[in-house]
Amino acid sequence: MTAPAEPATKSERSFPKPEFTDAEAGALEFPSSGSRSYNYFTPAKLRATTYEDVTFDVQPDPARHLSQGWIYGFGDGPGGYPHEWTALKSTDWHKFRDPNEEWEQTIYRNNANAVRQIQQNLDNAKLADAYNSWTPAWTKFVERNLGAWMHAEHGLGLHVFMAAQRSAPTNMINNAMAVNCAHKLRFAQDLALYNLDLSESLSGFDGSAHRAVWQDDAVWQGVRRNVELLTAAGDWAEALFATNVVFEQLVGVLFRSHLVMQIAARNGDYVTPSLVGSGEHDYNRDLGYSRALFALLTRDEEHGAHNREVLGGWLAKWVPLSIAAARELQPIWSQPQERTIPFAESFEAAKSGLRSVLADLDLDQPEELNR
């Protein structure tokens, strides 16, 4: 009888044993070591909003957390988002918060609501044959002038804000300008679709007339020149200031609010004001963040005087240009059959709006506004 076999011995795996020491970063005391919450920024209020959580510090900055410096850049220029891309200065660009608190969800929600409302209005207008009540003079006015304004909105969205929203030093600013860009492009698209709708629904409406008006009509060449010069502005803050503060107040609000929305109903048109009103609502939101940003810069403890001087120079450059563009639009005030407000009154209201904005920003009013 053979002896029982010895059981096979198990081979033990060799791996290093963990050693716990107090010599590493875990043993250090930080200001937030005892905190039960985590925040890498100081919120504007007691608690951080969702807007701040998803927007703040998304864009890197060597002054905050990016201790190794810029990790990418352009082949023919500096890395990242240099502060030198604008003549304005700030002790802390990260102080800016968009008063509209726009982030991904609100962008989709707000624009979807606007498009839905406009589409419902257009559908209702077709069902009610609302366009048949338009006067011939008003039909021609919309055909030529509202169509021409579409080019201004598209140019500002695609060539001013599309470029500017990549240039500011913080994501909070760039995000606000990106939403501004979306507003302009959506409104331009709304006007284009409205033009197609009228071409199909309104007999005698020439849906292609706006091209010749924008390119050749002397009345619109001042606006066109102003828009094209805005697209060439290299300083992102100058482009934003000259567009949202100067051009929009003196030309945009003048045309949209003080002309189209004032006289459309008297000419049998209740549809166009609802469309143009959505664009005016967008601008009011965009003016809100612009005011907040430039007020922060003009009241900067260290650079406020410098910034007011720079902005004053931009006013001297852009206000005469926009005033000239506005005055060249004067003949279209006499085109509709029913007119309720003279150009001088509309223009004075537009200039009053600009004066109010400049007062909020602690900026001196240019002499041209009093002429």
Describe the function of each predicted region:
Residues 136-216:
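Long, hydrophobic, well-ordered secondary-structure blocks that form the structural core
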Residues 124-145, 205-245, 265, 304-308:
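Acidic/His metal-coordination segments adjacent to aromatic residues that form catalytic metal sites
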Residues 162-176, 194-203, 230-238, 257-278, ...:
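Inter-helical turn/loop segments and adjacent helix faces that build the functional surface
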Residues 56, 61-63, 136-168, 234-262:
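Alpha-helical bundle segments that constitute or directly flank the non-heme di-iron/ferroxidase center
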Residues 176-197, 250, 278-293, 321-324:
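Alpha-helical scaffold segments in carbohydrate-active enzymes
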Residues 146, 177, 241, 272-276, ...:
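Hydrophobic packing residues in well-ordered alpha-helices of helical domains and bundles
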Residues 1-152, 300-371:
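Terminal targeting/low-complexity segments that flank the catalytic cores of oxidoreductases
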Residues 150-153, 184, 233-259, 280-286, ...:
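Extended alpha-helical coiled-coil scaffold domains characteristic of the BAR superfamily
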